[in-house]
Amino acid sequence: MSKVPDQVTVLVYSNLPEVRAQIRTAVGRRPAPDTGRIDWVECATNAEVVAQLDEGGIDVAILDGEAQPTGGMGLARQFKFELDDCPAIVVLIARRQDGWLASWSLADAVINTPIEPVESAAVVAEQLRRRHTGIPVVRG
């Protein structure tokens, strides 16, 4: 079992800059004492997300389920089927009732809106721990 590195990379995708800022602020620079310091990668389009994930090095991807024109849940499902080393994927959902859609997307975890800092940091920290301790992420 390996420990989380001192520096981790978290991608946040939303077409809305304010949503990306809310996520970054809620999760913070280090979501828990035992996780690495986050290097944030922001993406405003699905093409940017695809390019970043193809490049590799992303530990956790946070995808806005309400993003336009391509929502994060569809992207999550696509990545789970297409990427051999898919990072942990967290989907941001606007309604708790959309939890079934997040399950369909094969997301590893969800963050509900309104974005709550303690919950958001805990979700990201757990995914970072899982990523670096060999616990497999959900696969399609």
Regions found by a protein language model. Give the residues of each.
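Conserved acidic segment of CheY-like receiver
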Residues: 7-28, 61
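Short hydrophobic/Thr-rich beta-strand motif most characteristic of the beta2 strand and flanking loop
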Residues: 35-44
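Acidic, metal-coordinating helix/loop segments flanking the phosphotransfer/catalytic sites
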Residues: 43-60
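Conserved phosphotransfer microenvironments
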Residues: 59-80
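Alpha4 helix (beta4-alpha4-beta5 surface) of REC/receiver domains from two-component response regulators
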Residues: 94-110
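C-terminal output helix
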Residues: 115-124
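CheY-like receiver
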Residues: 132-140
